[in-house]
């Protein structure tokens, strides 16, 4: 009897503790749409840059969300399929017409529209980016601001590429 009363009190205490803790853990959820300046409501990709800003890729361009309003960026293609944020403040953005490099701090873009339909790519910094295009592996040459095929690499059977923290391409 004493044990069942004690168990009942413990359950009651646990219920009160949960009810008090849940509001403390809740976060504000708000709906963000074209009213806040987004170019399109269909968001296909999201990334957070090194400064904490959120970048959203939509069916009509790249959008920078500052917490209150969205700013739009036009790239090599309107359909932004993937965004990779690097630790040094850059974004590599895959569109339907190529892979573009965006300086997140200066808010400028370097367009590379000559590589449509890139499906796999990886990046680690503003100067390190690789992607597969038509069975070949391409690397970014920072000194010339362009991509070139890597010699001796046949990528027909490669399904995924990635860079490890040491800069080794897998």
What residues fall within each predicted segment?
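Carboxylate-rich, polar loop motifs that coordinate divalent cations or form catalytic acidic clusters
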Residues: 1-170
